[in-house]
Amino acid sequence: MIINVDLHIHSHFSGATSTSMTIETLAREAPRKGIDVVATGDCLHSEWQREIKQCERIDEGTFLLGETRFILTTEVEDKNRVHHLLLFPSFSSVDDFKERITKFSSNIETDGRPNVSLNGEQIAEFAKDVDALIGPAHAFTPWTAMYAYHDSLSSCYGDLTRYISFLELGLSADSNYGDRISELHRLTFLTNSDAHSPYPVRLAREFNRMSVKEATYREIKNAILRKNGNSVTLNVGLPPQEGKYNESACISCFRHYTLDEAVKRRWRCICGGRIKKGVRDRVNELADLPVPKHPEYRPPYLHIIPLAEIIAKALGQNSTFTKKVTKRWTELVDAFGSEVNILLDADIEEISKVTVPAVTEAIKAFREGKVIIHPGGGGRYGTIELPNEEERDTVRDKQKTLSDFLKT
């Protein structure tokens, strides 16, 4: 069977998250985004564990509420500020891991994403001891990421490097970025939302499509490990330019710089602010290949833009959270079942019967690959621009649909 999976989110017990990130809200919103299985996130937190345990238990590591299945995950920050994503097979595994790291953390009961005074190798060793999967979260982001503080997997994970089975690309990178680095060719790439709110523009803005026997932790683990015929068949995510850190830019005024310009200015903007190195430039530093070389098993990468963002631009709204945007998003999802279906597969003529012409034209422009993206940087997301009439007539590569990948 084919499932869509988002393996990195946070609960309302993590810092800077929405109070709406409850298990009930996630269970309700995931199907509207087209997602079958969602990470719990924050599973080390005692109060969040109590919410998770309200769900029906399918097996030791899989839980069900409504139409949505959950698997146990958390993110932790090590002593070098590197973030690691962990997936657990059961609550007993979670409890065992928590017992081992509690003495190294001062906020394990107060923050869903705890800080621990251990390095990546030590955390990976504990993960291995409890049979949990572990890999770098948003690996290229210039804050709190592996490649922000290390130049290689082994620098981060030491003797446990071979135990690392996956790498989360993050919003500012895709497979073409990752596969310019040879040491990553053996790893499964994951594309996850890292959602801090359940809003349509956040939850499942990136997700993975997997071929599994059933929608359970064990089968998802086998897909990540590429065992027993299971696999990740598609990575779905933002174009890298939409990420907050794609290009090098000032974190104060968001002025963009080339790498040479930033170096000459000693990473100080003309406004006096700090220039933060972008993912594109960091990959260029790390890459040992001039162009990406994808291993045979690497799935295609499908770029999507959140539907709420497309609607907001079509309606001339400055925010994706306005009542007008929410109304149009809701009427489309109610009519076609999920955001993924609307963006990629639903008949455009049928869409035109449900929404206003401006939104229909915007979705059509996205499908035709005519949406213009202005890169993000310095902590500000990239922005999109809809084509003018002349640009609408320009022939470009058509946006692929999920059905194009059914045979992968």
Regions found by a protein language model. Name each.
Residues 28, 46, 57-60, 70-72, ...:
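C-terminal functional module detector
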Residues 1-79, 370-372, 381-384, 391-397, ...:
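An N-terminally biased module of ancient metal coordination in phosphate/nucleic-acid-related enzymes
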Residues 2, 49-165, 398:
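Extended substrate/RNA-proximal surfaces in nucleic-acid metabolism proteins
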Residues 15-17, 49-50, 144-150, 199-211:
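Histidine/acidic-residue-rich catalytic or RNA/ligand-binding cores of hydrolases
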Residues 186-202:
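Short acidic/histidine-rich active-site segments
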